[in-house]
Swiss-Prot record:
It comes from Human immunodeficiency virus type 2 subtype A (isolate BEN). Interacts with the P6 region of unprocessed GAG. Interacts with host VPRBP/DCAF1, leading to change substrate specificity of the CUL4A-DDB1 E3 ligase complex. Interacts with host NUP153. This isolate is from a German AIDS patient (with predominantly neurological complications) who was probably infected in Mali. InterPro entries: Lentiviral_Vpx_assoc_factor (IPR053711), RetroV_VpR/X (IPR000012). Gene3D superfamilies: 1.20.5.4730. A motif (Nuclear localization signal) lies at residues 65-72. Its main location: virion. Residues 94-113 are annotated as: Disordered. This is Protein Vpx.
Length: 113
């Protein structure tokens, strides 16, 4: 009888698999941020990033990858809720709405250029 469990392809070690997961996390955050600016104010995106980093990394002592993962979860929930409530944005940039008199926007989180 053969073993039904998946096997790691030859030549792949745990290190490579973990590295691939970190690369996936980076790519996913960048893609989510690029889409989020079309639906959420840039200030909100920046604040979620900054507060996530401050709480999970600085206060709780979690790793950078864990902090990025928690940020990803929060942003996915925010985007889901936005669409669930009936998105009417259709690609308009939400970046400066309501910020005209508050000076330049803060620097964006990684991947949001």
């Amino acid at each position: 009888m053969t073993d039904p469990r998946e096997r790691v392809p030859p030549g792949n070690s745990g290190e490579e698999t973990i590295g691939e997961a970190f690369e996936w996390l980076e790519r996913t955050i960048e893609a989510l941020n690029r889409e989020a600016v079309n639906h959420l104010p840039r200030e909100l995106i920046f604040q979620v990033w900054q507060r996530s980093w401050r709480y999970w990394h600085d206060e709780q002592g979690m790793s950078a990858s864990y902090t990025k993962y928690r940020y990803l979860c929060l942003m996915q929930k925010a985007i889901f809720t936005h669409f669930k409530r009936g998105c009417t944005c259709w690609g308009e940039d939400m970046g400066r709405e309501g910020l005209e008199d508050q000076g330049p926007p803060p620097p964006p989180p990684p991947g949001l250029v």
